[in-house]
Amino acid sequence: MRFLASIFAGAIVAWSFYPGHWWASVVGMAILLLCLDSKPRKTRLKLTLAFALTFFAFHVQWVSVLGNDAWFGLVILCTLPWMLFALLPIDSRSKWFYLQPAALVIVLEAIRASWPWGGFPWGLLAYSQVDGPLVALSTIGGQSLVSGVVVVCAAITLKVIKFRSFSALMLLLFISICSASVSSFNSNDSVQLAAIQGNVPRVGNELSAQRAAVLNNHLRTTEQLLAEIESGLTPEPDLIVWPESGTDIDPLVPGIAADAISELASRSAAPILIGATTWYSSGSEGEGPTNSGIMWTDNGPSQIYSKNHLVPFGEYVPLRDVLAKWITRFDQIPNDFVPGEGPGVFDVSGAQIGDVICFEVAYANHIYDTINAGAQVITVQTNNATYGNTTQPEQQFAITRFRAIETQRAFLVASTSGISGLIQNDGSVTDKTKQFESAIVTGEAPLISEKTFSTKYPYWVLIIGVMFLLFTSRKNLPTRFK
């Protein structure tokens, strides 16, 4: 019965990542804690395995568009750190019951977000809370604090139901009040932004085969924006943003892409941030493609940011010599991408615009680095066409909303095929597109220079979590499973 309940708990937590279901994450974790309560290690291991496999099988099901083997492999990698949750006893009568499971989740999520190959920070409990009251705590302790408090609330819920604990109920009320008391930053300065969603000819991961199709779509949609500006229907933007891979032809190589973009930029009062794959070559450092954001003015390309956090098995192939013998589709990635160095911050008429590309928005440390480099507002250039009609675009948009609240920065998302949108620094969405349509996002975003506590001190929750576990688990760390 507990085995089935653990599977159900995993499904409930996966469901919590859908819009408006933030509370289900607390319920799912409470069910898991109930299943693990006072059970021996081997039983905890089996139940935690059932929970994590179910959770991630649902949550990252979208990766199956690349193949069921990719889906299976990712589920296993995401599940492995959760096995730490089974190492320490769960006892609802223990004085550490509220905090020890929370500390375990904080540590295992930190491991999963950074290992292996840079980690995969998807499916963190914190991201399920973007529509809930706990998300406000992200300004203090980032994703670690929010995830930890989700588990604390789950433990409190179990205490209230199992023991009719009045003190636990008061603690839950106290957490709610603390969450509600966190306020957003304000600014008198703002910037007018526009994002271009040109759309793609079809769903899938073979867009590169449709030479110039994506480029032409984004040229046409930008022409539409310029016409609306000229007619007075749309305010003049300070910056126009194309998505990742907004041009499927390298614009830094002289030719039709460079000519068309330069002609467009000459008629625009605002610079255009182009997303493109370009070729990097640097003698001793080697060469390869880069995933770049290129600031294009009427004088041509100027500032360039290249993606730092490359996607393993998407933009480069770890263990290529071994895996390529068994998985033939890695032939579609003949050259490993070259990572950029350092955050991307563009000066646009005095405004400091940070730029991140696609999955980079899920890496908290990279967003913090971008803000610490001076970013007052952040653009996200992304291409989610491969995962169209799955839950991936909505999940990534929710992560971006979380980042906006956590860092108190407005985020402009430009996607080739959706979802694009303008997210204010309080997480509210002032413009949002549907998938697989040509669309324009416009709006005003505040320019904020003040930094949240979590941005200035990003690791304090994790450090306390590790120290707490070392202190409370000295007698419980196993040399082997019983």
Where are the model-predicted features located?
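Soluble catalytic domains of enzymes that build or remodel membrane lipids, polysaccharides, and related
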Residues: 184-457
